[in-house]
């Protein structure tokens, strides 16, 4: 999981958790159910256009609003490989890592346009726009958070740690 490559979908600033997954769908916590409606309020056709491995590149404060783990669950289940933005709401930031959804803070994220392909290299701390050939350095992810991503989230991480202890 050292490199993530995918097609970019752009969304603006202040995309809140109600836009990521609308409250009307929260009667279920089934990831596959939630995936069918991800980002529907921003683009009703988005769930149909999305392909596994695609990457969301958004404006600042992505994931603001209500504290709900349904938002990163829906994104991950829909096949979103990563989210890149200049900043994230702190509770979304933590929920994303807890659910195993990779997110990256990149101040220049708005330079990356929809439809372009990017590669995110965790080892080098770089995002390369394969379309324009421009490379950006992203704000490093702390080692523990990298472990959460590598194991698929906090629950899987805890299970692995418990197995080690036995």
Curated annotation (Swiss-Prot):
Heterodimer of LeuC and LeuD. Pathway: Amino-acid biosynthesis; L-leucine biosynthesis; L-leucine from 3-methyl-2-oxobutanoate: step 2/4. Keywords: Amino-acid biosynthesis, Branched-chain amino acid biosynthesis, Leucine biosynthesis, Lyase. InterPro entries: Aconitase/3IPM_dehydase_swvl, AconitaseA/IPMdHydase_ssu_swvl, IPMI_Swivel, LeuD, LeuD_type2/HacB/DmdB. This is 3-isopropylmalate dehydratase small subunit. It holds the Pfam family Aconitase_C. GO terms for biological process: L-leucine biosynthetic process. Its EC number is 4.2.1.33. The keyword Cell membrane does not apply. Belongs to the LeuD family. LeuD type 2 subfamily. It is an enzyme of class 4 (lyase). NCBIfam families: LEUD_arch. It comes from Aliarcobacter butzleri (strain RM4018) (Arcobacter butzleri). Catalyzes the isomerization between 2-isopropylmalate and 3-isopropylmalate, via the formation of 2-isopropylmaleate.
